[in-house]
Amino acid sequence: SDSDQGGDRRFGSTTSRTGIMLCCNGMPYHWRSNKQPSTAMSSAAAEIVAMSECMKDVNLRMWIAEEIGIPVKWPVKIMVDNKAGIHFQKKVNPDSKLKGVFDMRLGWLRELHNRKKFVAVKVDTEKNLADELTKPLETRVRKRLTLELKRLRQEIWKTSTLGGK
């Protein structure tokens, strides 16, 4: 998951954008990019919204997989390029920037984290595949992210039960 903070001010938008890319065995199977419902007061708040939206998508797809008999492996990894987004999910008392609508999302994320449904993993922005979905990117950056996705897919394929033998 990823978010930008403040949207695209060239067009008068202050609403952040959430980008989500779900992968299975290194292959993206679901992605989306949406404006967030309200203006985030900080990049951490925007990241929490993105993480909660990502977990909603993950939960739905994992539930469907379980319903049709596909074994599901918890916890899932959420790649996050914002240290504050990882820190706030574990912090007991959110600061004033996360009051209101973010309290519900943060509480839900903490609950899922405590139930071992996901692990947030810090990843460099350059390697965050969802980064492409939050803002217009230069061709150079898009190519780099495409190569990173290919590398990730090959790495996962080598370690999976399907490939690498």
Where are these regions (language model features)?
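RNase H-like nuclease fold core
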Residues: 1-46
